[in-house]
């Protein structure tokens, strides 16, 4: 845990907090400094990945703000040992991180038809303006979650969604990738359950529940 300079952090966890309502405060950042630093790094197109193997309290919710803002990833190995499965996992994660195909200086925007809008954005990125996601790096493991709200009756048979990603590849070429989806609209609830991705819905619901509890 940082112990010197402007980013110095104090031990927030105490035995008296455990099992009480105050314990949830430990899951929130103790200071906005690291998130603000991440936003400043985004302006320089810098991304941060953390590989942490601390055996003691390290205030992960606070320092992970660097990854959250810059499109980075956070890898945590509790009570890390230099031999055994954890060492193999660390090697595999670093190797994958350095060798996977990566895009740089990326911006991503999703468009929906009139009468609908993107109401919430979730993921590791910095939001510019109201709907432009800025990611210093992007790759196959990058995931974002968007929530849509319907503001008027849609008379169309399908709901079109278009995502456009502008990025620079590893050869220095500026590229744009566009994905367009046309999702059928139905008032029959069973159609929804037949086609829903249960793993994705479960993960999103868990994140939403955790965020609402912390708020």
Predicted feature locations:
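Extended acidic, low-complexity intrinsically disordered regions
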Residues: 1-215
């Amino acid at each position: 845990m940082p112990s010197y300079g402007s980013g110095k952090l104090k031990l927030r966890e105490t035995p008296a907090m455990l099992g009480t309502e105050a314990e949830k405060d430990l899951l929130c950042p103790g200071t906005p400094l690291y998130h603000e630093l991440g936003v400043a790094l985004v302006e320089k197109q810098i991304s941060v990945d953390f590989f942490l193997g601390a055996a003691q309290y390290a205030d992960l919710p606070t320092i992970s703000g660097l990854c959250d803002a810059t499109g980075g990833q956070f890898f945590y190995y509790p009570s890390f040992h230099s031999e055994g499965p954890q060492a193999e996992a660390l090697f595999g994660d670093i190797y994958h991180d350095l060798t996977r195909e990566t895009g740089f200086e990326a911006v991503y925007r999703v468009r929906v038809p009139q009468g609908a809008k993107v109401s919430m954005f979730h993921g590791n990125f910095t939001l510019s303006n109201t709907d432009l996601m800025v990611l210093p790096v992007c790759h196959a493991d990058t995931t974002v979650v968007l929530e849509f709200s319907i503001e008027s009756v849609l008379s169309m048979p399908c709901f079109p969604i278009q995502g456009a990603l502008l990025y620079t590849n590893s050869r220095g070429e500026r590229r744009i990738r566009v994905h367009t989806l046309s999702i059928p609209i139905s008032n029959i609830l069973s159609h929804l359950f037949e086609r829903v991705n249960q793993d994705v819905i479960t993960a999103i619901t868990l994140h939403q529940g955790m965020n609402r509890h912390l708020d």
